[in-house]
A protein has these predicted regions:
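Residue-identity detector for glutamine
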Residues: 5-7, 25, 69, 104, ...
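Right-handed parallel beta-helix
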Residues: 98-132
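Active-site alpha-helical segments that house and flank conserved acidic catalytic motifs
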Residues: 33-37, 100, 121, 140, ...
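Short, small-residue-biased leader/transition segments that mark boundaries at the very start
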Residues: 1-2
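Short, surface-exposed interaction patches in beta-rich subdomains
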Residues: 113, 118, 128-203
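Short linear S-[DN]-x-LW-Φ motif typified by the pepsin-like aspartic protease active-site region
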Residues: 6-74, 78, 83-95, 99-101, ...
C-alpha cells in the first residue's frame, strides 16, 4: 500500500513538471524574480556577456514557471543531483525585486554581485552564501539554516537591512546580525537604524 502511494506521488509530480520551462523572455521584459529552490545545491551567476536569456544548467526539474504581464518571473525548481546553476544575464536593465527562498534542505551560493531595488533571501534549513549585494532594501530570513551575506561597501550607508531567525545565524560583512542559542538567548530580529544627522543607515 505504501509503495503504491509513493508511486502515485512520483507520477503526479512527474506530470506536474512536464510542460514547464524557463521563460524565453528577453531580459528587458523581466523586472522581478521570485524563485523557490528545493532539495539540493544551487548556484547563481549574475554575469555580463551571457546574452539576453536566462540559463539553467544541471540535473533539475522545474515544477512551475510563469511570467506575468507586469514583468515578474516566478519559478519553483528542484535540484535532483549535483549542482544546478542559474545564470542571470547582466545588462542595463535594473530589477525591481529579487526574492529567493531556499526550502527542503536547498543550499545556495550566489557568486557575483546581485543588484535590485529590493532583495529578499531566505533559507529553511540549508546554507545560503552571497559574495555581494546591492539594493535599497535587503531582507534576510532563516529558520534553522545559515545565511552569510556581503554588502558592497558603496551600498553600506544607503541600505535598509532587516534580518530574522528562528535559530540559525545570519551574518553580513562578517558581522553577526541575529542568532538564537539552544537556551533561547540571543537576538531574533535586526533592523538597522537610520541616522538623521548623517542621513545614512548604520550596520
Amino acid at each position: 500500500m505504501y509503495k503504491r502511494q509513493v508511486q502515485d506521488y512520483l507520477e503526479t509530480r512527474r506530470n506536474a513538471i512536464e510542460g514547464y520551462s524557463l521563460p524565453k523572455q528577453s531580459l528587458d521584459h523581466i523586472t522581478s524574480i521570485d524563485l523557490t529552490l528545493k532539495g539540493g545545491d544551487f548556484e547563481i551567476l549574475y554575469v555580463s556577456g551571457a546574452g539576453t536569456d536566462f540559463t539553467l544548467d544541471g540535473d533539475y526539474s522545474v515544477a512551475t514557471s510563469s511570467f506575468t504581464q507586469n514583468g515578474k518571473w516566478t519559478a519553483n525548481i528542484w535540484a535532483n543531483s549535483g549542482t544546478v546553476t542559474l545564470i542571470i544575464p547582466r545588462d542595463s536593465t535594473s530589477f525591481r525585486e529579487i526574492d529567493i527562498a531556499c526550502t527542503q534542505s536547498a543550499n545556495l551560493f550566489i557568486e557575483d554581485n546581485l543588484s535590485a531595488d529590493s532583495i529578499k533571501l531566505s533559507t529553511q534549513d540549508g546554507t545560503l552564501t552571497t559574495n555581494g549585494l546591492y539594493a535599497q532594501n535587503i531582507s534576510l530570513h532563516t529558520n534553522t539554516g545559515n545565511i552569510s551575506a556581503s554588502l558592497l561597501e558603496s551600498n553600506l550607508g544607503q541600505c535598509h537591512i532587516q534580518a530574522h531567525t528562528n535559530g540559525g545565524p545570519v551574518t553580513l560583512n562578517g558581522t553577526s546580525l541575529v542568532q538564537l542559542n539552544e537556551d533561547g538567548s540571543g537576538t531574533a530580529l535586526y533592523d538597522n537604524r537610520y541616522d538623521t544627522e548623517t542621513q545614512s543607515y548604520r550596520l
